């Protein structure tokens, strides 16, 4: 696959699609690609870029299954990145807190920043059809797709763990909790947890680490008190 230059103008979703393209088509590392695009975005947007791009990777088998069922034929050449933009749109619609209106509208608009304004209609149609057909509610009869794992890893776990493989698949896909360490040079544990209570952020305290706070739900890190 030919190298794809970074979009000339910054755009959150176009840049995220570029990152996904670089990882899947060019074999680049997520860290390397994210560092390039994050230089031109603020902290809040950088957190979003990381959450979305890595989220697509985590749900890739299912997202690709949906994409194949929605596209008549694969896109080729320099338009291939639009498939990755659509993957991002599908992820937003089904696995993120992004509103459906923004997930569709902003993703469609991002095609212009990827030199594919002529494919905006295709992006819109695919995402609308995903909603219309309620694909997210239709069960997928494929253990590998449902596991969310690459085929080689799925089979390796099956061979190694036998009857316990399903539990291992589930644990592999579980998102780790976020741990925070309170900097006592800046604030106290009591003051920080009070701020979390006020912001409605759910957490627990660690029995083994006196300065640690464990967030029980995924949140936008940049929205935490004191960020």
Tell where the protein language model's regions lie, with residue ranges.
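Class I Rossmann-like S-adenosyl-L-methionine
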Residues: 1-227
């Amino acid at each position: 696959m030919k190298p794809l230059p970074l979009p000339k103008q910054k755009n959150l979703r176009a840049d995220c699609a570029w990152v996904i393209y670089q990882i899947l088509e060019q074999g680049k590392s997520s860290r390397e690609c994210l560092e390039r695009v994050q230089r031109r975005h603020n902290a809040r947007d950088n957190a979003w870029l990381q959450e979305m791009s890595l989220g697509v990777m985590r749900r890739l088998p299912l997202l690709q299954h949906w994409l194949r069922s929605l596209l008549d034929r694969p896109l080729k050449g320099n338009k291939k990145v639009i498939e990755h933009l659509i993957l991002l749109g599908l992820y937003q619609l089904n696995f993120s807190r992004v509103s459906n209106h923004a997930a569709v509208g902003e993703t469609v608009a991002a095609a212009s920043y990827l030199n594919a304004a002529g494919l905006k209609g295709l992006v819109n149609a695919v995402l609308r059809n995903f909603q219309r057909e309620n694909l997210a509610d239709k069960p997928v009869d494929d253990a590998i797709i449902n596991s969310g794992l690459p085929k080689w890893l799925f089979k390796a776990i099956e061979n190694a763990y036998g009857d316990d493989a399903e539990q291992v698949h589930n644990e592999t896909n579980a998102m780790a909790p976020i741990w925070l360490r309170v900097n006592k040079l800046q604030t106290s544990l009591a003051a920080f947890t009070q701020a979390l209570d006020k912001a409605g952020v759910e957490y627990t305290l660690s029995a083994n680490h006196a300065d640690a706070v464990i967030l029980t739900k995924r949140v936008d890190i940049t929205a935490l008190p004191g960020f």
